[in-house]
Amino acid sequence: MQVYGEEGRRKVERHRQLRKGKGFATIERTTRVDLAEPEAGATVLLECMTNLAANEMFSGEGQEDAAGGREQGPGATETVIGSRILEDVERLYAKCRNLVIVTGEVASDGISYDESTESYIRLLQRVNCSLCQQAEEAYEVVYTIPVCLKKKPEEPAVGKESL
């Protein structure tokens, strides 16, 4: 999360305390999650895709210039940025044992926004759908209640006879 002001710092610290002792590797990056170097066999928590998508779309921070082949900032299309985010997440996943991604749903209020915000919403929807398709498991938390959207099929027990 790009931290702005005291409220942002308090929010980040609160989240750090909530994760403490849960077995997640903490790597703090506002963009380019593929550059993170978790310890071998780590379970990585990527929190939060809504912030990462906004940072990748609007800040341009940490991006290579045109010679490096990474289009950046508001001039880049949501399709280009979405593909880049998904590639970065794939490279991060290749470096760890488990990857847990927290995201948010930001378009259910029925409000019309300016074009750059609508573009961000489309970007996040595209990324979230793709991540859910690739995930072994996916949950939506509704008023603190986890609702399973997708669950990894249980493997049959060895030695059990079929019915």
Predicted regions: what they are:
Residues 2-5, 50-52, 106-108, 145-147:
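Conserved nucleotide-binding/hydrolysis micro-motifs of P-loop NTPases
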Residues 34, 53-54, 110-111:
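Conserved protein kinase catalytic core
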Residues 26-42, 84-96:
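Short amphipathic alpha-helices and their capping/turn segments at secondary-structure boundaries
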Residues 22, 31, 42-67:
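A basic- and aromatic-enriched beta-loop-alpha substructure that forms the phosphate/nucleotide-
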